[in-house]
Amino acid sequence: MKFDVIQHLRKKAEKYINRAMRAAESGNDLEAAKLFMRAGGTLITLGRGLEIEINGDKTEIH
């Protein structure tokens, strides 16, 4: 996985987290939860991409 792709996914997750924190501060818990889920999904995508690169596509997700 190229470094620029890693940086892109990290920044994308960071933006979701920052937006979620602002939503939570303003009392919009539902929107905050949605944004935290998106951030989590982005981080899972990043982790899975790195895992595939290291171990190949034969690894199991635990």
Per-region residue spans from a language model:
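Short, charge-rich amphipathic interface segments used for partner binding and complex assembly
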Residues: 11-62
